Each structure stands twice: as structure tokens, then as C-alpha cells.
Regions:
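Acidic/His metal-coordination segments adjacent to aromatic residues that form catalytic metal sites
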Residues: 8-27, 85-114, 177-192, 254, ...
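Short, solvent-exposed turn/loop segments enriched in Gly/Ser/Thr/Pro and often Arg
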Residues: 1-12, 59, 71-78
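Secretory-pathway/luminal and periplasmic proteins that interact with or process carbohydrate-rich
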Residues: 1, 15-16, 51, 64-69, ...
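Gly/Pro-rich turn-and-neighbor structural signature
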Residues: 1-18, 53, 216, 235
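An acidic- and aromatic-residue-enriched active-site/binding cleft used to recognize and process polar
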Residues: 1-13, 129, 151, 158-159, ...
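Active-site core of glycosidic bond-cleaving carbohydrate-active enzymes
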Residues: 32-67, 76-85, 90, 108, ...
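Short, glycine/acidic-rich hinge or "gate" loops at secondary-structure transitions
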Residues: 2-9, 141, 159-174, 214
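Acidic/histidine-rich catalytic neighborhood
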Residues: 148, 152-209
Length: 352
């Protein structure tokens, strides 16, 4: 997404950027999980399992520092991996914030996009588990990584709830995932659907590998994916043969949120990567209605860069939508080599 190995003089992309070919828009040594994950998910189905451990080991090497973040900043267990992270396990300093207020939580990135976004590690945990399902891989070296990543969410959100009141769980015995973040888009969320779907799917998959009572109990504390009704104007009323407003049940980005800060569509993450909804699964219509009627999903729809609308369309059985978006995504780029896309939201070439 950020140029890969094949960068060239940035003035050919943006004449204002008078730097060397080593320039990358979001920094040269920073791992941005939201972008990187889309390079690795397809490797499961293409059988390129030998290419995946380099990414898994990247996180495994950083595990101790990620755990130290939790110990030092909040005095609890679990690994806290940030979205934009250096190869030693700490946040990119520019995103962490050079001009931070002294009173601000030292564990948080002082950044409107990245604050509270800690769940992208769970996609790589799921990939690790899937390599066992697809290829019978020995994932023993990564089990501490998976367990520590899950533990963080359990301990951190119990801690935050206990600071606000007497009880660590809600009235239904569920974690209160607040404050959270649904991708970089919906901020200060309460129970983001993307985080809930991630925790539920990783826990369900991990329990099949390690049937431990601890993880079963944690699974019981994960709240349901939040739903909401959206008014759809000019819907066909078959009984009256007229066009009247209707209400469609859809996946909500979260139970609540304070602002929108980017253009991702986390309300469809329960479709992909988490596969809770899809063809052959329950409540397919809820997910399809989210795709077709959610106003932000429609506003944010695109084939550019890390956009994954074509994947969602395919998972929902929307063949023509998937075809149209995929053809647009894979059309020739603007450079001599036709598969050099970008800059899109990032840099050129954009591989994701």
C-alpha cells in the first residue's frame, strides 16, 4: 500500500514531493496493519503458506514490548498492539504524538484516527489459526501471541469499566468495549461491531484448538454484534402496489459513537474478514441490507486502495456487484507497469 519495494522518484506522483525514491507517504519503517492484512488474507486460498510466517513472526517478536505497554501504562496483563506500529512493538512516534498534553493517557496515541484502535492484531491471530485449518501448520509458537492479544481486551475493558463504576461488566454479563474504535472511522465507540466480531470469531476458532475453560468464559462475555434499523425511502409496498418508506434491519457500526473520522465501513467487517454473515449463513438479508442501504456504506463505497467492497459483495453473493468492483480495482494503473496502482489513499505502487 505504501510503495513496497518498487518505489520511484516521488516527484512523478506529486511534484511537490522533492525526495528520494525511498520516500513513502506514511513513513518507511512503519507497519500499518489495516493495509498490510489485505496482502496476507488471500495467501490462505492461494496456498502460499510459506509467505505468511514472516508477518506472524513480526508480531511474535514484538510480543514482550506489547505486553510491557499494558504493564507499564495500565498495570494489567495482555498485549496491546497499536494500528501503526514500529518493528520493536511501540507506536510510531509521529502517531503517538510529539506534542502530547502531560495529563493524557500515556498508553494512548494522541491521534484522532488511531486512538483506541487495537483490534487489527486479531486479524493476524485469525490468519494464524486458519493456517492450521488450511495446511495443518504447527501454530504452537504463536499460541502465547493469540492468548495475550485476547487477554488485553478482557483485562483492559474490565479495568476501564471498573474505573467508571462498581461493575466490570454490563447487566447481561458482557464486556463494555468503551471507549473503542471501529477502524479509524467511528471514534469513541461503545461496542464496535468490528471489534465484537473479531473477538467472537478468534475466540470461537481458538477454543477448537485449545478447549480451555478460560476462553469459553471470555467468549460468554462478548456482546452481540449491534444492529439498527435504517429507513429506506421509496420502497415497494407489494400489498398496496405503491412506493412507501420501509425500515431495514442492518449491522450497526457500534452501539454508539461520537464522531466519524475516516471512510472505512466497519459495519461490514462481520461479513469479511470475520465471516459471521455471508452466503449459506444465518441472517444474510441483514448483511445485504447493510451493504445496500447503510448511508455511510454507500457514501464510502469505492474500488480504490484498501477498499474491500468487492470482497463484501462476493461474500454476500452479489455477483454483478463483485464483478464490477473487481474489474474497476484491477484495471490498468496510470504507470508503465499496469499493476502499479495508486497513490489512492496511500502511495505508489499501491499493492492492496
Amino acid at each position: 500500500f505504501n510503495g513496497g519495494l518498487f518505489t520511484f522518484d516521488p516527484c512523478h506522483i506529486d511534484e511537490k514531493q522533492a525526495f528520494t525514491p525511498d520516500y513513502r507517504k506514511w513513513g518507511g519503517g512503519t507497519m500499518t496493519a489495516q493495509n498490510q492484512r489485505l496482502v496476507y488474507w488471500p495467501m490462505l486460498k492461494s496456498g502460499d503458506f510459506d509467505m505468511m510466517p514472516s508477518q506472524f513472526n513480526f508480531y511474535n517478536r514484538m510480543l514482550k514490548n506489547a505486553e510491557l505497554r499494558s504493564h507499564v501504562y495500565w498495570q494489567h496483563e495482555g498485549a496491546c498492539f497499536c494500528e501503526q506500529i514500529e518493528n520493536f512493538g511501540l507506536p510510531n512516534p509521529a502517531e503517538y504524538g510529539f506534542k502530547r498534553p502531560a495529563w493524557f493517557d500515556k498508553g494512548l496515541e494522541y491521534n484522532a484516527w488511531l486512538e483506541y484502535e487495537w483490534d487489527t492484531i486479531l486479524e493476524f491471530c485469525q490468519m494464524i489459526l486458519e493456517t492450521k485449518n488450511y495446511a495443518g501448520a504447527d501454530i504452537t509458537p504463536y499460541l502465547p501471541l493469540i492468548e495475550s492479544s485476547l487477554t488485553f481486551f478482557d483485562e483492559h475493558y474490565r479495568l476501564l469499566a471498573s474505573r467508571r463504576g462498581r461493575k466490570a461488566l454490563d447487566g447481561d454479563g458482557h464486556l463494555i468495549l468503551f471507549p473503542g474504535s471501529a477502524c479509524e472511522t467511528y471514534k469513541m465507540t461503545n461496542n464496535a461491531s468490528s471489534t465484537i466480531a473479531a473477538l467472537r470469531t478468534v475466540l470461537e476458532t481458538y477454543i477448537k484448538v485449545c478447549n480451555n475453560e478460560k476462553w469459553q468464559k471470555m467468549l460468554e462475555t462478548i456482546p452481540p454484534v449491534p444492529l439498527r434499523y435504517i429507513e429506506v425511502k421509496d420502497s415497494l409496498n407489494l400489498q398496496a402496489s405503491t412506493m412507501t418508506p420501509a425500515w431495514k434491519q442492518t449491522i450497526s457500526p457500534a452501539k454508539s459513537w461520537e464522531r466519524i473520522n475516516n471512510i472505512e465501513t466497519p459495519q461490514l467487517y462481520p461479513v469479511f474478514p470475520w465471516r459471521i454473515y455471508g452466503v449459506g449463513k444465518e441472517n444474510l438479508e441483514i448483511a445485504r441490507d447493510t451493504y445496500f442501504y447503510d448511508p455511510d456504506a454507500l457514501k464510502f463505497r469505492s474500488h480504490t486502495g484498501w477498499k474491500q467492497d468487492n470482497i463484501w459483495a462476493a461474500c454476500l453473493g452479489l455477483t454483478e456487484e463483485a464483478k464490477s468492483l473487481s474489474l474497476a480495482k484491477l484495471s490498468d494503473g496510470p504507470h508503465r507497469f499496469p499493476a502499479f496502482w495508486g497513490p489512492g489513499y496511500d502511495w505508489t505502487p499501491d499493492h492492496n
